[in-house]
Regions:
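Core segments of cupin and vicinal oxygen chelate
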Residues: 1-28
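Well-ordered beta-strand positions
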Residues: 10-12, 34, 85-87
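Short beta-strand micro-motifs in enzyme catalytic cores
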Residues: 16-18, 43, 80-84
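Short, charged/polar, Gly/Pro-enriched secondary-structure boundary elements
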Residues: 25-31, 91-92
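Histidine-centered active-site/metal-ligand motif
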Residues: 27-29, 44, 75-77
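Solvent-exposed, charged amphipathic helical/linker segments at domain boundaries
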Residues: 28-42
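Vicinal oxygen chelate
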Residues: 47-94, 98-106, 110-139
Length: 139
């Protein structure tokens, strides 16, 4: 991705995962690659939304349409963004996010320890509807 497409590394979990942003993007990451076993593979793709309201609204809509929550909603400490992940039927996950840190061209990638605390400041494990009493349209 870096050599062939021009993605830039934003941050990393050394030897474990890489946060990459597309050419011209100032979002913290558009793609996250995670090493699992002996392979490096696709973990998730991120879709940037305008604000936390769209993350929650979109997340509730996806839930109503039968998409299974992987994790979220929640907030990442590395990018400061709000998130909601959905299991992708083809593998990996799709992430709705908003309010990510603005990454300048002079950004220097940082190395982080991989831990639950570095992944999420807070998060719901099964989506917000379960905890809030929100009607999702399912009976």
């Amino acid at each position: 991705y870096v050599d062939r497409i021009g993605f830039k590394v934003t941050d990393m979990y050394p030897g474990r995962g890489y946060f990459l942003r597309a050419p011209g993007s100032h979002e913290h990451h558009n793609l996250f690659l995670l090493k699992g076993g002996d392979n490096i593979g696709f973990h998730h793709i991120a879709f940037e939304l305008r604000d936390i309201h769209e993350v929650f609204g979109g997340g509730l809509h996806m839930t109503d349409k039968g998409w299974e929550t992987h994790l979220g909603p929640g907030r990442h400490p590395l990018s400061s963004c709000y998130f909601w992940y959905f299991k992708n039927p083809c593998g990996g996950a799709a992430e709705y996010d908003s309010d990510s840190d603005y990454i300048t061209d002079g950004w220097e990638p940082a190395e982080w320890e991989s831990s639950p605390e570095s992944f999420a400041e807070w998060a719901y494990a099964e989506g917000a509807a379960r905890y809030s009493g929100i009607q999702t349209g399912k009976t």
